[in-house]
């Protein structure tokens, strides 16, 4: 079912590594689930929905195997149809022109849930949001949570035309590892503070309210450097649907490793 993810998630470096790992875990789970019913399903079906009888199986076992294969084929067809629909919907949205003098908001999210026996449930959640305002102003927010690996991460980016300052934070609840990284696009790290002030100034022109772009605050990360202060300013007070699961996420802690990198765009 995880194949239902749109290409916007699969092709995004922020999500891709976690998606591939989760997909492999799902495949292993499905293989272990089908073994008690039909062992190797590929050896049972001829690929056209017909099931061959095998020696050593009685009629009851063959009937169960046929039912299992038919059910899986039905589910696979449903998933395939849904994925085609989502891809078509995504193409239609991509064709919509964005008015540079207007405001826009776009949001996508996905969630998978699985549970076998007495094992804890495995939940994978991912979401992405983009807000735009006149003057090339944009805010991007991405979040991901994988209960199986224990990884939770979030990225918030502020953009003015081709310049951007992106802050990424992550925490692995199983290992305790925490990290905050900063990415500077078409700018140097020394320009970050001036850029953030410019971004806030541009946003304030549009009489910000509760749900506007600059309504963000970050919890303290234990270091009063420019990156940490900007994290505080950017955090959203509401719970993030991809990180939160009935409570406020504790992605940030008291001791984090801060890293920064500059990226030059090839756009002219």
Curated annotation (Swiss-Prot):
Region of interest: Interaction with COPS3: 50-125
Record key words, sorted: Cell cycle, Cell projection, Cytoplasm, Cytoskeleton, Developmental protein, Differentiation, DNA-binding, Nucleus, Phosphoprotein
PTM annotation, UniProt: Phosphorylation is required for binding to YWHAZ.
Region (Disordered), start-end ranges: 208-268
Residue(s) carrying Phosphoserine: 6, 8, 32
Residue ranges, compositional bias (Basic and acidic residues): 226-237, 244-257
One GO cellular component term: cytoplasm
Keyword Zinc assigned: no
Main location: cytoplasm
Family of this protein: Belongs to the MLF family.
Subunit record text: Interacts with CENPU. Also interacts with NRBP1/MADM, YWHAZ/14-3-3-zeta and HNRPUL2/MANP. NRBP1 recruits a serine kinase which phosphorylates both itself and MLF1. Phosphorylated MLF1 then binds to YWHAZ and is retained in the cytoplasm. Retained in the nucleus by binding to HNRPUL2. Binds to COPS3/CSN3 which is required for suppression of COP1 and activation of p53.
Function: Involved in lineage commitment of primary hemopoietic progenitors by restricting erythroid formation and enhancing myeloid formation. Interferes with erythropoietin-induced erythroid terminal differentiation by preventing cells from exiting the cell cycle through suppression of CDKN1B/p27Kip1 levels. Suppresses COP1 activity via CSN3 which activates p53 and induces cell cycle arrest. Binds DNA and affects the expression of a number of genes so may function as a transcription factor in the nucleus.
Protein name (record): Myeloid leukemia factor 1
Organism in which the protein naturally occurs: Pongo abelii (Sumatran orangutan)
